[in-house]
């Protein structure tokens, strides 16, 4: 079969292994790295990958051939935890952060999430759409081709739905594919202060059924943290969401360990997020339950904390992990996944292969798109990130610089040398 598109002579092509499950523990050390590699694309899907000169059968009279000496290729990068859609910004809290005021104290003062809730409730659909689209453009320019996006800055039905509607519209309109997560349980809204269980009952009885009926989200998430929602409250919401057919996520062990990882393991959550203060016992439970750890080192960096998620312990225990931005206006105002990948090396001591597996094949499993993206297996969508680097180590070693040369989405060139095509 001849290719429509043949990308040749890469210095290296990074090929994650899709073993039919996320890469656990030692498996994350493994990948195929093709020297002088090529990628053949047919009808927007991967036809073949290999080293050296492509087989003559791949080349026809209409095959477009492009050479990439001095470049590397990876599957399109996947940002599997973001809070993409929100109103306003929170630079006015920055001085407090620099002065050492804890995040939970800022939240208790009506800042943090609640500040963004007010701004998001006031924002129109068009305002949220335009702002989120600009963020997606930035992500695309940095090699990202799929993004998970949460609601959670409305905390009422009208605004939560508006956020999810924006995600749906951008999924249709933008080159990046989006995966939607419903997270009305991101905080207790001011009007329910002191009545968190009552608010969760509102979510369960009124919001979740409408989200499911209107097919607005695939996942349900909750913030299990001291001063927000307890482990029992998280178990209540997520068990109800599971009964309705949602896949589960949980923000857990970010600031204090209060049992969120136990809930993740008990309910078979797809992923647990943050895990900066995860305990050895919690790690063991998540490994046994095959819960993916979505790790967010840029959040630790932004909060000016010293405690990064214990990624090496997780791998030694046999967990699967990803790296992702947590892009949001407060605790992690960035949309640069390449920087997060570099933090994974510098601050978590992950290897380049482990990092690249984390943002490709494991991230694909985290967003339930493993059959479509995350590796260069034949038949998967031809999402390809091409970096201006001589080997796979270089973009992790040479930090704080966007090395994206080109991006292909489903076989279509969408980024070329710093601009969206």
Curated annotation (Swiss-Prot):
Enzyme kind, highest EC tier: hydrolase
Pfam families per record: Amidohydro_1 (PF01979)
Subcellular location field: Cytoplasm
Catalytic activity: 4-imidazolone-5-propanoate + H2O = N-formimidoyl-L-glutamate
Residues given in the record as Fe(3+) binding sites: 81, 83, 251, 326
Residues that bind N-formimidoyl-L-glutamate: 153, 328, 330
Entry EC no(s): 3.5.2.7
Binding site for 4-imidazolone-5-propanoate: 90, 153, 186, 254, 331
Gene Ontology cellular-component annotations: cytoplasm
InterPro entries, A to Z: Amidohydro-rel (IPR006680), HutI (IPR005920), Metal-dep_hydrolase_composite (IPR011059), Metal_Hydrolase (IPR032466)
BP GO annotations: L-histidine catabolic process to glutamate and formamide; L-histidine catabolic process to glutamate and formate
Cofactor: Zn(2+); Fe(3+)
Function (record text): Catalyzes the hydrolytic cleavage of the carbon-nitrogen bond in imidazolone-5-propanoate to yield N-formimidoyl-L-glutamate. It is the third step in the universal histidine degradation pathway.
Cited NCBIfam families: hutI (TIGR01224)
Family membership noted in the UniProt record: Belongs to the metallo-dependent hydrolases superfamily. HutI family.
Protein name stated in the entry: Imidazolonepropionase
Organism per entry: Streptococcus sanguinis (strain SK36)
């Amino acid at each position: 079969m001849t290719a429509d598109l043949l990308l040749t002579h890469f210095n290296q092509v990074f090929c994650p292994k899709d073993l039919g499950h996320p890469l656990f523990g030692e498996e994350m050390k493994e990948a195929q790295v093709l020297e002088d590699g090529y990628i053949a694309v047919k009808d927007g899907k991967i036809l073949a990958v290999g080293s050296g000169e492509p087989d003559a059968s791949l080349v026809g009279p209409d095959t477009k051939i492009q050479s990439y000496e001095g470049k590397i290729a990876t599957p399109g990068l996947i940002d599997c935890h973001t809070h993409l859609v929100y109103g306003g910004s929170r630079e006015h809290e920055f001085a407090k952060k620099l002065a050492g005021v804890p995040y939970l104290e800022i939240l208790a003062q009506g800042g943090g999430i609640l500040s963004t809730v007010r701004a998001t409730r006031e924002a129109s659909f068009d305002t949220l759409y335009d702002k989120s689209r600009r963020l997606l453009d930035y992500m695309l320019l940095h090699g990202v081709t799929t993004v998970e996006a949460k609601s959670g800055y409305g905390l009422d039905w009208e605004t939560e739905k508006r956020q999810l509607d924006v995600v749906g519209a951008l999924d249709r309109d933008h080159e990046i594919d989006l995966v939607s997560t419903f997270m009305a349980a991101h905080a207790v809204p001011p009007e329910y202060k002191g009545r968190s269980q009552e608010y969760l009952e509102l979510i369960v009885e009124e919001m979740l059924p409408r989200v499911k009926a209107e097919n607005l989200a695939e996942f349900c998430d909750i913030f299990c943290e001291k001063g927000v929602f307890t482990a029992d409250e998280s178990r209540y919401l997520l068990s109800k969401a599971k009964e309705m057919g949602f896949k589960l996520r949980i923000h857990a062990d970010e600031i204090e360990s209060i049992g969120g990882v136990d809930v993740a393991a008990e309910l078979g959550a797809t992923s647990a997020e943050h895990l900066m203060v995860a305990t050895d016992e919690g790690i063991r439970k998540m490994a046994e339950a095959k819960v993916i750890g979505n790790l967010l080192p840029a959040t630790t960096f932004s909060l000016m904390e010293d405690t990064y998620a214990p990624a090496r312990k997780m791998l030694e225990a046999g967990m699967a992990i990803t790296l992702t931005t947590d892009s949001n206006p407060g605790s992690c105002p960035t949309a640069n996944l390449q920087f997060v990948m570099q933090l994974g090396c510098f601050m978590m001591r992950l290897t380049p292969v482990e990092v690249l597996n984390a943002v490709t094949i494991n991230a694909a499993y985290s967003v339930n798109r493993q059959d479509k993206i995350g590796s260069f297996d034949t038949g998967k969508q031809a999402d390809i990130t091409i970096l201006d680097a001589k080997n796979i180590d270089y973009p992790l070693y040479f930090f704080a610089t966007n090395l994206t040369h080109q991006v292909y989405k489903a076989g279509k060139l969408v980024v070329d040398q710093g601009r969206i095509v």
